[in-house]
Amino acid sequence: MRHSQYLIPLIQRGYVWTLTEQIFPLWEDLIDRMDAIAAFKVDAEKVGGAEKLRALRKHFLGTVVVGSAKGGGADTIPTREVIDGQQRITTLQILLLAFRDVVKPLEDEGLDYSLKTLTRNLGKYRERGHHLKVWPTNVGRDVMQALSDAGSIEAVCDRFPVKGPKKARYERPLMVQAYLFLHALLAAQLRGVRYDDSSAEPLDELDELLNEALGEDGSAEPTIADQVIRSIEKDNVVVPPRAELPLQAERAHLLYETLRDGFQVMSLELDDEDDPQIIFETLNARGAPLLPSDLIRNFVFLQATRKREDVDALYDAHWKAFDEKPAENAKKEGERFWRKEARQGRLKSVRLDLLLYNYVSLRKCEDLKVAHVFEEFKGWWESSGKGTEFELARITSTAKHFETFLLPNQTSRLGLFCRRMQLLDTSTLTPVV
């Protein structure tokens, strides 16, 4: 990763890994390999050399597919587009950033420099973000920049609180949650405290009620990892467990050795003539299904990239709201308007999929199946002959009217009509109206 940047293109979805589903299992794998390497060292000393022992297996993290290097010069950095594996590569970068910040108090120049070269492109660059090793999609860039610049868990907590004035509640971005979790457990591990040790903290009333609602007896003692997750969800300041204990340099070096030698990632580099969109769709065909709106966004901005259009400007003007607009009456700050499920007659899908379903039906003057929206959109787009800016502007304009169908205000004739359509549970006229 020296002097290069992994660029997550707009054909990818944002960061979606969660603490319980992906980050915690990754941490378990890391500690498993760390324990194995520590035991291997002891055994090697007993038998008189590592060459007399069977080599340790490495933990396979998966495959990362990247494009060929583009650009690079005196004040620019060569970039590689990540076609598949962005969740893994982003998480590993967050892990390295957290590790970098944890070991600062040790003042170990060698370790500091090694982690610095893995988390930052050293030098002066004219483009924003070129010093970062991983540059996410537009939605995550400010977060990754903040994590890179913060330098401490305290600064990250201050930048991304969960509680605000007047009892306001915020949901920390998933990348921030990953950083806080990994930082806290890294710091604990370097103090000799394991993630599965008992936290010795009794459950509060809210957690007891939750256990009761889930039918759990609560007999299992909460662990250090449980304590950290609860703190990330509830506390403005996340304090690493047993923070009064000193950090141990030998543990830090063992952890670095584990990351360097105990994990394996397969990297595949595409040739210039390979089609990243086709490869991306093929690789994800059997994974977590992408929504039609995800595929449409990927297709549109890949086409714009090929035409050398200003993709960032197009995204900010015409698609950013689809990714970031807050939901009405949101229970949590992170809920998004266009990602909420909605029902329209016999159809049930996320709002953005329903919008695009109706939009394509309108443009093609045909009745479609919502499952075929992407294929229909792609065929219509390629035959329309209109420019990217023109068509995206029409979609965003249509979206404003579609919001009235979703949330009729009844203060206008259109709103009253949409309310009556909802009561009749009919959607036949939606594309026409």
Model-derived regions: residue spans:
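An acidic- and aromatic-residue-enriched active-site/binding cleft used to recognize and process polar
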Residues: I11, V66-A69, Q86-Q87, I94-L97, ...
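Flexible phosphate/Mg2+-sensing switch loops adjacent to catalytic phosphate-binding sites
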Residues: V42-E45, A50-E51, R57, V103-D142
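Short alpha-helix boundary/capping and kink motifs at helix termini
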Residues: M1-I83, H253, V265
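Phosphate/oxyanion-binding active-site loops and adjacent basic polyanion-contact surfaces
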Residues: T18-L30, R57, Q87-T91, K167, ...
